Swiss-Prot record:
Its main location: nucleus. Residues 9-61, 62-116 form the HTH myb-type domain. Disruption phenotype: No visible phenotype. Reduced indolic glucosinolate levels in adult leaves and loss of responses to brassinosteroids. GO terms for molecular function: DNA-binding transcription factor activity; transcription cis-regulatory region binding. Transcription factor involved in tryptophan gene activation and in indole-3-acetic acid (IAA) and indolic glucosinolates (IG) biosynthesis. Acts as a direct transcriptional activator of both Trp synthesis genes and Trp secondary metabolism genes. This is Transcription factor MYB34. GO terms for biological process: cellular response to sulfur starvation; defense response to insect; indole glucosinolate biosynthetic process; L-tryptophan biosynthetic process; positive regulation of DNA-templated transcription. GO terms for cellular component: nucleus.
């Protein structure tokens, strides 16, 4: 439904009110009281819209309107009520005697809102403004990629170079539990799980188990060449750059290069992914009798 206009547009005066118009409106309301705003202009001898007469009286001419600066108590009341009711100025005005909704709205927009912002408080939610702004969203924190990057790299290395790999050791690599976790707690060192794994790998000849050259390996391609080619592989390089602790990579390289330079590789060893690592573990040796120390 469309609301009918309160008065006809023809002959209606707009703009600022004159003192004479104010006096006519005041005199009429003193005699007849408030109400009947649609017919009031004609009865009071005003060429104004009924709505304009009502707002002029409510916001400027009403005798109980409180003038002057807002007190600190009024400021606190407005802020508290705004936090509860939002921009419902008429509802807020009922709690501040003598203050009009229009005056409160203007005072909020020109003073209180800016004051709250200076104190680091959001004028809409009335909560502290986050360091990222007023959106309330926190920046995404990049999760450490050390564990996943290391696991993927070790799987790649194991699948290419290993002949025998201890089942418990690989389980520790993938899940980070059992002995590895206990060693980490005992040592108190952030990198102790990695160091423990590397020591155990070195002692049990995990990564380079034999110096025998396999038939699928060409005579003119040495272990060193394969080693360098492996670490220069684009995918391995990507993993390398995502690992936080580069000391881990250096230790791993030193283990891979440890021993006879003629150490061979398995030509068609399957690639191991973290997702299906447990299936890959089952095919490996379960012997874990040697204890090594990697300095």
């Amino acid at each position: 439904m469309v609301r009918t206009p309160c008065c006809k547009e023809e002959g209606i005066k707009k703009g600022a009110w004159t003192p004479e118009e104010d006096q006519k409106l005041i005199a009429y309301l003193h005699l007849h009281g408030e109400g009947g705003w649609r017919t009031l202009p004609e009865k009071a001898g005003l060429k104004r819209c009924g709505k304009s007469c009502r707002l002029r009286w409510a916001n400027y001419l009403r005798p109980d309107i409180k003038r002057g600066e807002f007190s600190p108590e009024e400021d606190d009341t407005i802020i508290k009520l705004h936090a509860l009711k939002g921009n419902k100025w008429a509802a807020i005005a009922t709690s501040l005697a003598g203050r009009t909704d229009n005056e409160i709205k203007n005072y909020w927009n020109t003073n209180l809102k800016k004051r709250l912002k200076q104190k680091g408080i959001d004028a809409i939610t009335h909560k502290p403004i986050n360091s990222t702004g007023q959106t309330g969203f926190e920046p995404k924190v990049n999760k450490p990629v050390y564990s996943s990057g290391s696991a993927r790299l070790l799987n790649r290395v194991a699948s290419k170079y290993a002949v025998e790999l201890n089942r418990d050791l690989l389980t520790g690599i993938i899940s980070g539990n059992s002995t590895v976790a206990e060693d980490s707690q005992n040592s108190g060192d952030v990198d102790s799980p990695t160091s423990t794994l590397l020591n155990k790998m070195a002692a049990t000849s995990v990564l380079i188990n034999t110096t025998t050259t396999y038939s699928g390996f060409s005579d003119n391609c040495s272990f060193t060449d394969e080693f360098n080619e492996f670490f220069n592989n684009e995918e391995i390089s990507d993993i390398y750059t995502t690992v936080d602790n580069f000391g881990f990579m250096e230790e791993l390289k030193s283990i891979l290069s440890y021993g006879d330079a003629s150490a061979g590789v398995i030509e068609n060893s399957p690639e191991v992914n973290v997702a299906d690592a447990m299936e890959f573990i089952d095919s490996w040796n379960e012997d874990d009798n040697m204890v090594g120390v990697f300095v």
